[in-house]
Swiss-Prot record, chain B:
Protein's UniProt name: Borealin
Lineage summary: Eukaryota, Metazoa, Ecdysozoa, Arthropoda, Hexapoda
Tissues where this protein is expressed: Ubiquitously expressed in the early embryo. Expression is restricted to the ventral nerve cord and brain during later embryonic stages.
Highest rank taxon of the organism: Eukaryota
Keywords: Cell cycle, Cell division, Centromere, Chromosome, Cytoplasm, Cytoskeleton, Mitosis, Nucleus, Phosphoprotein
């Protein structure tokens, strides 16, 4: 049975004004909604709600449906067991993650802490985009260089 | 018979040199493009830091210490009258306009209309500030994803991000895998293995030297601008490359001098003070345009030598 506060939060999240957070899975409710197929029930230690609380959103497939990724550090974990504790696994495999260091669920976060995490997540997204673009840019131009060299000979 | 081989070799060498020069230019351009991408990334990262600090500074202490569930409920009350004081509302509205001006790369009209709605609402609360700043941060991220040269390629990828794997593209892990226990009795969740991408080795700076030398040589194909020449010693025979030996009878001067060829002879300048009366206009009329340009170049070279020599003497 969910508490009334959680229901109110879920209702408020239905509005369009919070959709800007969904793209980066910043809010716990958005992370819960990302789990399309999860092999463990709500009674397990690594249930959907507990996974989302620890910062994980679903990045699995039909074949590997137990894959989840942290929205802050980007660490992807699979091979979950029913008795795994998401927070402990998060700290174990990603000790440098700011969210794992905090070990604080969203309901206890202050606005200041949330803004710090927001900045970290946005900067991580920028760095990821730059890295992907640079690698594709270099790869395409190296193809052109190979074609040029082959044609000249 | 052996003479016919020389032109072919020289032609082949010229083609190889052209190809290598093009490859070198390509690498230079690639390096400059990658550097500009890095500077753009740094610019956006610092913009994010600035906006987060601005937001933390503007938000009131009571609001900053609120828990997230309460703030999320405030988001729902964006259209209602706020409990904050009038002065606080003015301060928050000012921070909204400041954040609007701080953003680079203007958002499209659809997003602009949403901002207008938020600005027009009376009694804006802290939640709208949070939403506006978050929207601006995310728009900054979105603006980066449409670089000029590969816009069409990125447009295709943008369509793929709508699929279930879209989140993977955004926050896919690229960090090395952490060590997990190998015992089979207690199996722990393991991280997916990621292959680190090999970084491309940059070209050495020594490779760029031939280009500079070639540029220098193209200016004067026969003789470099500065060369140490030796006069024949008294009685020494100077051999000519084009015929019989040539006996040099000119004795070397002890003083610096400049010889300027003119139509009917050579104008020799000595390191003495030259008056305007001594320079006859008839001699100067015989100078052609090429010689005049050469004299200007010599003047610049001499000035450079004088400056450097003066510095060396003073040290």
């Amino acid at each position: 049975m969910e508490s009334p506060v959680v229901n109110e939060v879920a209702a408020s999240l239905g509005g369009e004004k919070l959709e800007v957070f969904r793209k980066l899975n910043l809010l716990e409710q958005h992370r819960v909604e990302s789990y399309k197929s999860w092999p463990f029930p709500e009674t397990a230690s690594c249930s959907i709600s507990k996974m989302a609380e620890a910062g994980f959103y679903w990045t699995g497939t039909k074949r590997e449906n137990d894959t989840a990724t942290c929205f802050v550090c980007g660490k992807t974990l699979d091979g979950w067991e029913p008795e795994d504790d998401p927070w402990k696994e998060h700290v174990k495999h990603a000790p440098q993650c700011e969210f794992a260091k905090l070990s604080c669920p969203e309901r206890n976060l202050t606005v200041s802490q949330f803004l710090e995490i927001l900045g970290t997540v946005v900067k991580g997204s920028i760095e990821k985009t730059c890295k992907a673009f640079k690698s594709s840019f270099v790869r395409e131009n190296e193809k052109r260089l190979d074609e040029f060299t082959r044609n000249q000979k | 018979m052996p003479r016919t081989k020389i032109p072919k070799n020289s032609k082949r060498n010229r083609e190889v040199a052209n190809r290598e020069e093009k490859v070198r230019l390509y690498e230079l351009k690639m390096d400059s493009r990658l550097i500009s991408i890095d500077s753009l990334e740094t610019k956006f990262l610092s913009a994010v830091d600035h906006q987060v600090k601005t937001l933390l500074g503007q938000v009131q202490k009571e609001l900053a210490n609120l828990k997230m569930p309460e703030v999320l409920r405030l988001f729902e009350e964006l259209d209602r009258f706020s409990d904050f004081k009038a002065s606080d509302q003015t301060q928050l509205l000012a921070s909204m306009s400041m954040s609007g001006s701080a953003i680079e790369g203007h958002a499209p009209s659809a997003t602009g209309s949403r901002n207008d709605e938020e600005d027009s609402s009376i009694g804006a609360s802290g939640g709208s500030i949070l939403a506006a700043h978050t929207g601006s941060l995310l728009r900054s991220t979105k603006a980066m994803r449409t670089p000029g040269p590969l816009h069409s390629a990125r447009a295709r990828r943008a369509r793929r991000s709508r699929s279930a794997c879209g989140d993977l593209n955004i926050l896919h892990s690229a960090k090395p895998p952490s060590i997990s226990s190998s015992s089979s009795s207690s199996r722990n969740s393991r991280s997916k293995l990621r292959t680190p991408m090999a970084s491309r080795a940059k070209a050495f700076s020594a490779d760029r030297t031939p280009l500079k030398q070639k540029q220098m040589r193209s200016g004067s194909p026969t003789t470099p601008p500065m060369a140490f020449l030796r006069y024949p010693k008294p009685g020494e025979v100077a051999l000519s490359k084009y015929g019989s030996p040539m006996v040099a009878q000119v004795m070397p001067d002890k003083f610096a001098n400049v010889n300027i060829p003119i139509r009917n002879g050579v104008l020799s300048l000595r390191p003495k003070k030259l008056d305007a009366d001594e320079v006859e206009s008839n001699l100067l009329e015989n100078l052609d345009e090429d010689t005049l340009n050469q004299i200007k170049t010599l003047h610049e070279n001499l000035q450079m030598i004088v400056n450097k020599a003066s510095q060396a003497v003073f040290k």
